[in-house]
């Protein structure tokens, strides 16, 4: 029995169908347009590196967007090859450094290493701040509870008057 949402075609294969009952053709290849990074992100990154009075044309932004997507995919491919050579499935910063050296971009390794170290320090600081906030919240909650208990005890006391 075919899976739900599939329809038998004339050649005997089962293919998924859309809500209208038409078979959905599987996409064989992806183009770069399917993988592009958001233009807003690319534009913000480009503006950070350019002078304040610089203007980026629409065509230039598209070229930067496509180049960034291709470069990251290329580096990820080389990093993945390095990880697989090391018997791992996950790409580490060291794999990226090896990939940079493999594609003759070794001059960028020191600056990328510095950026990775800064990022790791930021992450560690955020974790510390989160722990401190959680402890402060816990202290605040426990002090609020003790104040509430004290108020309730005072409210339960009855004043005795000798008449």
Swiss-Prot record:
PANTHER family xrefs: DNA POLYMERASE EPSILON SUBUNIT 3 (PTHR46172:SF1)
One annotated GO biological process: DNA damage response
A single GO molecular function term of this UniProt record: protein heterodimerization activity
Protein name (Swiss-Prot/TrEMBL): DNA polymerase epsilon subunit D
Protein role: As accessory component of the DNA polymerase epsilon (DNA polymerase II) participates in chromosomal DNA replication.
Subunit structure of this chain's protein: Heterotetramer. Consists of four subunits: POL2, DPB2, DPB3 and DPB4.
Protein's organism: Yarrowia lipolytica (strain CLIB 122 / E 150) (Yeast)
Keywords of this entry: DNA replication, Nucleus
UniProt KW tRNA processing keyword: no
Coiled coil regions, renumbered to chain: none
Annotated Basic and acidic residues bias: 126-142, 154-163
Leftover remarks: In eukaryotes there are five DNA polymerases: alpha, beta, gamma, delta, and epsilon which are responsible for different reactions of DNA synthesis.
Domain of life: Eukaryota
Gene Ontology terms: cellular component: CHRAC; epsilon DNA polymerase complex
Listed CDD domains: HFD_POLE3_DPB4
Subcellular location: Nucleus
Annotated region described as Disordered, given as residue ranges: 1-22, 126-163
């Amino acid at each position: 029995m075919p899976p739900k949402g599939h329809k038998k075609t004339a050649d005997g294969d089962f293919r998924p169908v859309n809500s209208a009952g038409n078979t959905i053709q599987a996409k064989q290849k992806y183009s770069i347009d399917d993988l592009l990074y958001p233009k807003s992100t690319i534009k913000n990154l480009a503006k950070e590196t350019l002078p304040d009075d610089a203007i980026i044309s629409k065509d230039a932004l598209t070229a930067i967007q496509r180049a960034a997507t291709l470069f990251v995919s290329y580096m990820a491919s080389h990093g993945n090859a390095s990880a697989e050579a090391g018997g791992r499935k996950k790409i580490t910063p060291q794999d990226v450094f090896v990939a940079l050296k493999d594609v003759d971009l070794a001059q960028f390794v020191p600056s990328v290493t510095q950026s990775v170290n800064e990022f790791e320090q930021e992450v560690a600081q955020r974790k510390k701040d989160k722990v401190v906030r959680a402890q402060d919240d816990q202290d605040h909650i426990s002090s609020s509870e003790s104040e509430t208990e004290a108020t309730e005890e005072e409210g339960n006391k009855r004043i005795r008057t000798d008449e």
